[in-house]
């Protein structure tokens, strides 16, 4: 138990502040549950209402109540660390690529193999392969079922584009087109409005996508190397640098946040994940907002988007249960319902998120009347990469955000040499972190 506690303390201290799941409310206790009640923890308040509705539908047939509690991202992991050290854990909860490798290695999660083998509702071949692989240990043991998947799109403010005479983004946009549009808006407003904003600590919905568009990888498919320091990686990061020169300074982003800047009409464009749609759909000025495909990198120089030039990151949360839950059968039954075709379709229909099961997300595009969210679905007709991870993802992710990583070019984007040097440093940071795992 001391070994587990030490591992999880190190993990929590290293955790990134980036979460795949937007706003959250603080608070929410958890308990070990009882034979007729399950406690569920998540970190995204945007999803609570829809997921509780699905859980209530399960409760009507199971006779077991299930209460969803929202815990903010930081406290979420502190809570689970305490549970792993001998305290109480929620019965059912979300897992994430940042942390799940250590959870699986330390017997904190309920092993699901026997349940899956006897469950006609679950066939792992029906889910996105990257998500299944994430929650399957190297010995074949499965510790979570795919809850959802997400993609990234470009969000823009039509009113600001109109005000500054800039044409709306289209599927033909390159990253250079985005740069020129952002530059026009920033300069046209004398800096009162930023053409774009990127939170550089939010890698999944931001700069990771450009690295892949230009032909490099943050982590390779074998999870044992990177090409961030290659010519292709440097080209992608050079484009990131250019965008930052016409966007909101990172000091402003750190203070206000890209979402708040956008909702207050202080920036005209951001890139954002599908898990955040509802926050913008319910915002005061949502009629001004529209989504578009992420731009592409015209690496081949032929004026069209070729294979490998437009990527979207995708990730997927997993539904897991505590190995110490007092009612493992009910916990799995609930997870199975969430992840069954019925539950996955309900999740899409209610606009919670797109499904972790393939072929169930079309209804998601119709869940937001008056707002076209089809770019998130359309992104899958191009290229996807699974959110990069290794056994100790947060070690190198954290280091990339520090001095010696990308901190200097983030803060001083006008200096191209700083970015090139940071890419070389990043290559070493990731390689050394993997070697130490």
Question: Model-found features: residue ranges?
Answer:
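Glycine-centered hinge/linker elements that transmit conformational signals in sensory
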Residues: 181-184, 222-252
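Long, aromatic- and glycine/proline-rich binding clefts that accommodate carbohydrate-like moieties
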Residues: 304-305, 349-405, 437
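A structural signal for short loop-to-beta-strand junctions that line the ligand-binding cleft
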Residues: 82-83, 90-91, 121-160, 303-312, ...
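Paired acidic/hydrophobic, glycine-rich loop segments that form the ligand-binding mouth/hinge
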Residues: 91-94, 268-272, 290
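Conserved N-terminal structural module of periplasmic/extracytoplasmic solute-binding proteins
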Residues: 4-6, 17-108, 117-124, 168, ...
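Extracytoplasmic/periplasmic substrate-recognition and gating elements
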Residues: 56, 60-61, 164, 242-248, ...
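Short helices/loops that flank or line small-molecule/ion binding pockets
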Residues: 77-89, 160-161, 179-184, 256-270, ...
